[in-house]
């Protein structure tokens, strides 16, 4: 069970419709350190571990830029610059770049550690503790990567260039980029990384355009109202019927009929699409 102190600890969270990701400020997902880390689809964790190792060690965080749609993690690996750009589509899309900014050649071993356990959110919340930490699943080989499957769910993790272990010799100013995609089958990434990233970053501005806006002569109040509009979008999931507000983030990111009705009624003047959903 996650304590109140852990709930307000510094984690980075991204959400897009029914997917949300929780990680440390270096982008790593370590459920042994924070029980709720991982990629979630509704009330099921479809990826529990996601770590980057450079020459056998985890890089140290030196910078972070994150908004509602994407996050950029800046890391240092003994003088090598590591950048992780992450957003959500049908799962996680991530671009990992290792750059040699030194004046000498560097031998680099880039290794990606991944894992899945399909834990239930009820376990993370403490309602059913035995569901919080199921045994990890051994991956099987799949086209372009690996596959984890249990109880009707299957997660596929792919890498381009293929493989989760890469050895490179980088000269001064050279870099190496690896794309890692995590998707819940049968969905798979539908676009190249950059166009998909632009589309992800457009989700919240488009939502704001569809909502009623209020402007005042107080800049701080305007910023508060804009953030509140974005927060409502983050709460919402997409279903065949339309947008549906969930109860709360992160561990109540599931539909509750009463909560959704109350939220939709209050937001009728802002965006009636929620009530239709």
Placement of each model-derived feature along the sequence:
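Terminal accessory carbohydrate-recognition/targeting modules of carbohydrate-active enzymes
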Residues: 1-229, 233, 239-243, 254, ...
């Amino acid at each position: 069970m996650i304590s109140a102190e852990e709930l307000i600890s510094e984690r980075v969270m991204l959400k897009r419709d029914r997917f949300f990701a929780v990680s440390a400020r270096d982008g790593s997902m370590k459920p042994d350190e924070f029980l709720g880390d991982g990629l979630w689809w509704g009330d099921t964790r479809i990826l529990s571990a996601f770590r980057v190792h450079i020459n056998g060690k985890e890089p140290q965080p030196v910078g972070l830029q994150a908004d509602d749609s994407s996050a950029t993690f800046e890391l240092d690996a003994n003088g090598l610059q590591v950048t992780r750009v992450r957003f959500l589509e049908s799962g996680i899309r991530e671009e990992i770049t290792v750059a040699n900014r030194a004046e000498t050649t560097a031998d680099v071993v880039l290794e990606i550690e991944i894992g899945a356990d399909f834990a239930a959110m009820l376990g993370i919340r403490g309602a059913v503790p035995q569901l919080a930490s199921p045994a990890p699943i051994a991956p099987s080989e799949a086209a372009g990567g690996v596959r984890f499957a249990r109880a009707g769910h299957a997660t596929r993790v792919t890498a381009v260039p293929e493989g989760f272990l890469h050895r490179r010799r980088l000269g001064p100013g050279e870099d190496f980029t690896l794309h890692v995609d995590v998707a819940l089958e049968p969905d798979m990434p539908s676009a190249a990384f950059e166009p998909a990233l632009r589309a992800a970053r457009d989700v919240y501005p488009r939502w704001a355009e569809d909502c009623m806006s209020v402007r005042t002569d107080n800049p701080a109040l305007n910023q508060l109202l804009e953030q509140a509009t974005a927060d409502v979008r983050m709460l919402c999931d997409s279903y065949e019927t339309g947008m549906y507000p969930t109860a709360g983030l992160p561990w109540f990111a599931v539909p509750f009929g009463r909560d959704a009705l109350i939220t939709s009624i209050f937001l009728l003047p802002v965006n009636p699409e929620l009530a239709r959903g």
